[in-house]
């Protein structure tokens, strides 16, 4: 009987360890808050993408205050930012989504910007 109890306890401990380890890993398609180097890389992507947007027919925005950055693996990477953007004359609270598919030579980056108080959404791909 003690052997059965010991095996049950050992099994529960193993299941707990596996569940804890799985919770720490990013699930493909799952959304996760970005921290550390991942957050730093995502912020660099935001700045570079906003700069690229300004070289075309898009507006010229600068990220002032980023309050949240999430990442998701979906046929590439989708980063979502809650950010205050400044266009030189006005500051707006916005949601910015940047979807990158680096293996595509053309149309591998898409940016969508939706700001509070605005009716439309900016949507550009290059």
Curated annotation (Swiss-Prot):
The keyword RNA-binding does not apply. A motif (Secondary area of contact) lies at residues 72-76. The gene is Cys. The keyword Disulfide bond applies. This is Cystatin-like protein. One of its GO terms (biological process) is sexual reproduction. Disulfide bonds join 94-115. GO terms for cellular component: extracellular space. It comes from Drosophila melanogaster (Fruit fly). InterPro entries: Cystatin-like (IPR053128), Cystatin_dom (IPR000010), Cystatin_sf (IPR046350), Prot_inh_cystat_CS (IPR018073). The record marks 29 as: Reactive site. Belongs to the cystatin family. GO terms for molecular function: cysteine-type endopeptidase inhibitor activity. Keywords: Disulfide bond, Protease inhibitor, Thiol protease inhibitor. SMART domains: CY.
